[in-house]
Amino acid sequence: MTALPLYFDYAATTPVDDRVIATMLECLGRQGHFGNPASGSHGYGDNARQAVERARQQVGELVGAPAESLVWTSGATESNNLALKGVAQASDMGRRHIVSSRLEHKAVLDSLLELQRQGFDITWLEPDAAGLIQPEAVSQALRADTLLVSLMMVNNELGTLTDVASIGQRVRAHGALMHVDAAQATGKLNIDLRHMPIDLMSFSAHKTYGPKGIGALYVGERARGALHAQIHGGGHEQGLRSGTLATHQIVGMGSAFALAGAEQAAETARLGALSMRLREGLLNLPGVHLNGCATHRIAHTLNLRIERPGFNAAQLSSRLAVSSTSACNSASTAPSHVLLALGLSPAQALSSLRISLGRFTRPEDIEQALEVLESAVKAPPALW
């Protein structure tokens, strides 16, 4: 069997931690918590419901949110759809204006384009030269009819940060709602929704060493009653998301978020050192440049532009698992919309790589990656 390449695509997805798998197995099979959590007439349902609510508490503890403010979804894409379309469809105040940016994930961009087709007016903020959305730019975009502002906390392609707390204060003072996509932030940044002016926040398990197919949406007090369900049929999750709850996946998300909280400080320091070694080694190579702000970013993700004649990122695939764009766009050969928004040319965007580190990245992996990339960057261009 051909050996798999070294994994440097943690921003696309993370492997499920073995400790998380163990908790999920407790919910499968005849001896597990296999009951329907909505069945309150017997112990099977009670046990499953208790497991679900324990997981809800675990997620809430990581992000500083009351357990009852969290709605289970199938992932951050559904959470984003529920937040954006749910708020828009519930609006009866004549507010038809939404503010977002060109840097957002496709789950946000495409949802907003759909709302635009339905008659909503969308203001698309442009990033500054460092690839950041500044609070002042948001303030300037706010209007009397602004309903919602939606921005990501950590950019999935660049690893850059948005000051959502400062922006949220401005949005709240204006009387609009603030939604944040935090799929790339959990376990990496401190999030305390008790003290953040955020009304809606989207989460994903599979970006945090949990299973795919499960996520959550935080619905703050200001957003309650201002959200229309997108999936109907049973009134589950306070009427906001119908469907039988997947106990094993939910328990996996709770376990993953609990582990992320317990290990965040140590893991951030460890990955910071590994990332610095990788970054310094690569930026010393000819023609290699960092895309996005060098300071306001998480250590886990690097986006590098390699401007060398003949460099072909596809040649790396047998040795390194990296991305040239978001995983949701990888089937397309078009350049990254995020990199184009930064002002890069299509050729520059196509010569860029996203390298993302994670829990199972070892120091020796960094050294091997440096060897592979140095060889690829310095290789002479092909003559045919």
Predicted regions and their residues:
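Pyridoxal 5′-phosphate
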Residues: M1-W384
